[in-house]
Structures are given as C-alpha cells and as structure tokens.
C-alpha cells in the first residue's frame, strides 16, 4: 500500500530540496508530480485539486520564501495538508454505555461478518470488554454459521434465534446481554449487493429499537472511488459514526483513505491489516501520513515487536529500519523471536 505514491511524492520533495528557494516555476513543477501521484493512487479528482491548490498557496507564502530549508518546509506543508484530509484522528469509539452497542453495516461481500469478530477480539484485548455477538443477518444462513464459527474460535458467545425478524433478534439480543452481564454488544446485520430501501428500512428500525452508540460501515478499500458513493448512500439513511476500511494491506492504491473522510465527513475508525483475527488496527492519521511520506510507520513496528522483544530492543530495531541500516542478522533475530 502507498509504495508508488510514496516514491512519486519523494521525487517531488527532492526537487524542492535541491532548490535554494521556492519559486512559482519549481513549485508548479513539483505540484504537477504530486497531482499525478495522487490521481494514480485513485484519490478523488476534486480532493486532489483542492489539496494541490492549498499546498501550492502555502508553499509560495512569505514564511516559506524566507526559509533557509524550503524543502523541509514543503515537506511539513504536505504533511499538514494530508492530515487535514484524513481528519483529526478522533477514531475512538463511544463505549460509555453499559452495554455499549455497536452496529456494523455494509454491502454483501464487504467482509462485515469477519470484521465483527476482529473488532470484538480487539476490544476484549485492548479495553477489557466482555462482548456478545448478535447474529441479525437473517437472509444468509451462511452468515450466521460463519459468526458462530468465529465465536467458537474466539470463545465469544453468539446470540441467535430461529426466526427471521432481524429487528426483534437485535432487541432480544440486547436484553439478553443486559441479563447476562455483557458490557459490549456487536450486531451483525444483513448486507445487500447494493444500497436499497428494504435494507435501509430494516437497519433504521434496528437503530431505533436498540439505539447503538456506534453505527460503523465496513467497506472494502479495493472498490476504490465507488467507496464514496457507498458511504454517502448509507450515511443518507443512517447516522454513521465511522467506517472500517478492509484490505488496506492488499493491492489497493490507498486513495479511498485519502478521499473518504474529506468527501463524506464520516471518520475512519479502523483499518484491516490482514485476514487474521488480529488483523484490525485503530486508524491513526499521523501514522498513515508518515507511511505515505516515506518515513515508515515506526510506532506500528514497535508495537508489533513488543509482543516478542523488550521495548529497548524494539526501539533500536525501529530506528535501524527507519535509517535503512538493518542487516541480515537483525532480520534473522526478529524472525527467530517471532516463531518462539
């Protein structure tokens, strides 16, 4: 993810770093590369136009002209504007209620059912929650079986009923959670091949009956620009509180992450990093911008390493990776520890 975008942005940054001052000509040349890089990464055209105009305007400002290191200032402007696109970083969930209720929605095939298991697993580990999963996708028997299988793998109870009234199942499931002392409820809802009225009416009814604190749309980042229409389609009917972008570790160009929040106003809460049950991570704009600009996501490296090595060694490893100084022995050392 972002490899091509990172390379092209680095080229643009290096052009400015090689100049003594920023001028209309050299900034226009650099911004042309930035514009093409973003478009090739599948960032929305309107977003690209607005972004490049703002960067150019700031780069030609008086403070930048006075700078002894215009390349560094240009890099900071790029970073600040990318952060503006991605949002303020408020990806935290509202877990203040007892039980806290999270309703997951999405199109058929978006990976909603597996994601609900990943989210329950994450919140149990990170927040110490006791989750209950509710199987309210009554139109696809395989979805209920899949959720039950996930529940067995994770040792998390799944609430299901033999009836086909999804609204009633959700309502009964929440009551069951209260009786049994669960402090977190995650509701798996039905998906469709496209946004339709029947789907939305059912989701609106569930929302009205159980009043979830979070309504999160699960979306496959591989669908690119179509993601914007899907987010807006759901958000027009439901008060979405966030999105989960799946398959951000795959062949996706990543443009949807840079377009979605800016165009829809719906924050990204989590991103999918693998198909494994721990392959979900809280979205952090600072980290993503760091990756885009070629600095690497050092904090993620450290967090992953801390599970098998101590903090001091993790920091040393991360610094080596950032500086490009890791040798074969370093890699072999981490590989040996990861399989212990």
Segment roles from a protein language model:
Residues 339-340:
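Conserved small/polar residues in nucleotide/adenosyl-binding loops
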Residues 9-136, 143-163, 169-179, 183-189:
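Primarily NTPase-proximal linker/entry elements flanking Walker-type ATP/GTP-binding cores
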Residues 39-43, 63, 83, 191, ...:
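Amphipathic alpha-helical interaction elements
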Residues 138-139, 163, 189-191, 221-222, ...:
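Conserved Walker B
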Residues 1-7:
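Generic start-of-chain signal for non-secretory N-termini
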Residues 14-21, 34-38, 58-65, 287-289, ...:
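Short hinge/gating elements
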Residues 170-173, 182, 194, 198-208, ...:
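Conserved phosphate-handling catalytic cores of large alpha/beta enzymes
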């Amino acid at each position: 993810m972002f490899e091509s975008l990172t390379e092209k942005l680095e080229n643009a940054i290096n052009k400015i770093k090689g100049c003594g001052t920023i001028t209309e000509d050299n900034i226009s040349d650099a911004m042309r590369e930035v514009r093409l890089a973003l478009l090739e990464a599948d960032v929305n055209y309107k977003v690209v136009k607005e972004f490049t105009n703002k960067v150019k305007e700031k780069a030609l400002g008086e403070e930048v002209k006075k700078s002894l290191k215009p390349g560094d200032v240009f890099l900071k402007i790029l970073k600040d504007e990318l952060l503006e696109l991605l949002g303020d970083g408020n990806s935290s969930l509202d877990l203040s209620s007892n039980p806290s209720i999270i309703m997951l929605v999405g199109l058929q095939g978006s990976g909603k059912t597996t994601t609900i298991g990943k989210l329950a697993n994450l919140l149990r580990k990170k927040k110490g929650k006791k989750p209950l999963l509710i199987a309210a996708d009554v139109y696809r028997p395989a979805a209920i079986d899949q959720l039950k299988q996930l529940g067995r793998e994770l040792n998390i109870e799944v609430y299901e009923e033999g009836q086909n009234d999804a609204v009633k199942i959700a309502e009964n499931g929440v009551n069951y959670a209260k009786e049994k002392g669960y402090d977190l409820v995650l509701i798996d809802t039905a998906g469709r091949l496209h946004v339709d009225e029947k789907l939305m009416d059912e989701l609106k009814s569930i929302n009205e009956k159980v009043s979830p604190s979070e309504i999160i749309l699960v979306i496959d980042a591989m669908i690119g620009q179509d993601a914007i229409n899907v987010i807006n389609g759901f958000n027009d009917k439901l008060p979405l509180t966030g999105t989960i972008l799946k398959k951000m570790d795959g062949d996706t160009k990543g443009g949807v992450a840079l377009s979605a929040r800016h165009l829809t106003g719906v924050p990204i809460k989590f991103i999918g990093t693998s198909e494994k049950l721990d392959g979900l991570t809280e979205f952090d704009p600072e980290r993503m911008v760091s990756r885009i600009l070629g600095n690497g996501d050092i904090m993620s490296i450290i967090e992953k390493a801390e599970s098998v090595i101590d903090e001091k060694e993790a920091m040393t490893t991360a610094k080596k990776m950032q500086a490009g100084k890791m040798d074969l022995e370093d890699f072999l050392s981490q590989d040996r520890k990861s399989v212990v």
